[in-house]
């Protein structure tokens, strides 16, 4: 049963699904759609052509779908789509897109922590975590299972690859390859996100191959492109490696991140069932 507090302001035309909870002093504008089982907590503000997926919770004072912070915007009809079972926490801001017909898209099962900012024309995959005060500029792409640490700033048009983990306080100016971990400003890749991949039950052999490919690409005396081709020949039959190589060979206009922590590259081992296995 839908439960709407009498102090909530819901404009005519807004579409409200079944079993929706709308708490005190919420504002829902006329072009918003709330799917079934959505919870909108006090003082949240939802504007624009915004669709909130089933089971998602919008926490107090979050702002979604308002005018993009882009001087190029001239009132075009643009969209925000948030998937199912997401948590949009307190004071998070998700603006609408800039160009006619474009969408800011957030996938399913994402956690957007307090004060995080998702700017115009961003695309976020499934199971993504944006930590407190993470700031995404316009046109950023964050792929599935990526984790962005607290107070990270991501430059416009950058891509963050799947399963990547970006450490807190980092400044991201170039594309971050999938499956990697890193930190710093300027950003330094620290290797493969071994713990995250293990937690997601990626097979040991795949994790080991990714570690070897990373070292081949980032430590080789050959050029970056040549190292990728060598990795393709040796490990390209593994889907995750293929994804890593394709990502690096097809960067955004920002280019691929090539800075790597020298100390991390000296670590030649990976855990398997408690034992240390040389790579």
From Swiss-Prot:
Gene3D superfamilies: Hexapeptide repeat proteins, Udp N-acetylglucosamine O-acyltransferase, C-terminal domain
Keyword field contains Cell inner membrane: no
Molecular functions per Gene Ontology: acyl-[acyl-carrier-protein]-UDP-N-acetylglucosamine O-acyltransferase activity
Top-level taxonomic group: Bacteria
Chain spans, region Disordered: 256-279
Subunit structure: Homotrimer.
Protein name in UniProt: Acyl-[acyl-carrier-protein]--UDP-N-acetylglucosamine O-acyltransferase
Protein source organism: Chlamydia caviae (strain ATCC VR-813 / DSM 19441 / 03DC25 / GPIC)
Gene that specifies this protein: lpxA
């Amino acid at each position: 049963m839908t439960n709407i507090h009498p102090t909530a302001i819901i404009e005519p035309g807004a579409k409200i699904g079944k079993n929706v909870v709308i708490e005190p002093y919420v504002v829902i504008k006329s072009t918003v759609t709330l799917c079934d089982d959505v919870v909108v907590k006090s003082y949240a503000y939802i504007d624009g052509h915004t669709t909130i997926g089933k089971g998602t919770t919008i926490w107090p004072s979050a702002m979604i779908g308002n005018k993009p912070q882009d001087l190029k915007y001239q009132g075009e009809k643009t969209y925000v789509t948030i998937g199912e079972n997401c948590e949009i926490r307190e004071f998070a801001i998700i603006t609408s897109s800039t160009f006619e017909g474009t969408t800011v898209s957030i996938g399913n099962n994402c956690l957007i922590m307090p004060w995080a900012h998702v700017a115009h024309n961003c695309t976020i995959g499934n199971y993504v975590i944006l930590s407190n005060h993470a700031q995404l500029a316009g046109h950023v792409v964050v792929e599935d299972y990526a984790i962005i640490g607290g107070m990270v700033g991501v430059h416009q048009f950058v891509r963050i690859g799947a399963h990547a983990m970006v450490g807190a306080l980092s400044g991201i100016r170039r594309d971050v390859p999938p499956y990697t971990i890193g930190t710093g400003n300027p950003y330094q890749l620290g290797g493969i996100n071994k713990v995250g991949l293990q937690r997601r039950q990626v097979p040991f052999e795949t994790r080991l191959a990714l570690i070897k490919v990373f070292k081949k690409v980032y430590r080789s005396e050959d050029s970056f492109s040549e190292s990728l081709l060598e990795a393709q020949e040796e490990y390209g039959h593994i889907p995750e490696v293929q994804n890593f190589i394709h990502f690096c060979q097809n960067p955004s206009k920002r280019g691929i991140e090539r800075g790597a922590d020298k100390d991390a590259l000296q670590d030649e081992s990976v855990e398997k069932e408690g034992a240390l296995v040389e790579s």
